[in-house]
Amino acid sequence: MANESNKTVKVRLVRGLRGTQSRHRLSVRALGLNKLNDVRELKDSPQVRGLINKVQYLVQVEE
């Protein structure tokens, strides 16, 4: 159980937000990504995975 809680995912913003839906922009901001090529290491949880799935065309995920 302890190993599962320590899992993280690295998320990188690889496409610009111009011309995207406002909900998708908010999801990217919720992931902590502000500029192009920003990288955040986030805890691997269902909530984070849901945000990533919503904007999968804008981000790159490294497990």
UniProtKB/Swiss-Prot annotation:
The organism of origin for this protein: Stenotrophomonas maltophilia (strain K279a)
Keyword field contains Ribosomal protein: yes
Pfam families: Ribosomal_L30 (PF00327)
Subunit structure: Part of the 50S ribosomal subunit.
One biological process term in Gene Ontology: translation
Recorded GO MF terms: structural constituent of ribosome
Family the entry assigns: Belongs to the universal ribosomal protein uL30 family.
Matching NCBIfam families: rpmD_bact (TIGR01308)
Alphabetical list of Gene3D superfamilies matching this protein: Ribosomal protein L30, ferredoxin-like fold domain (3.30.1390.20)
Protein name per its UniProtKB record: Large ribosomal subunit protein uL30
GO CC term, one of those recorded: cytosolic large ribosomal subunit
Keyword field contains Ribosomal protein: yes
UniProt keyword annotations, A-Z: Ribonucleoprotein, Ribosomal protein
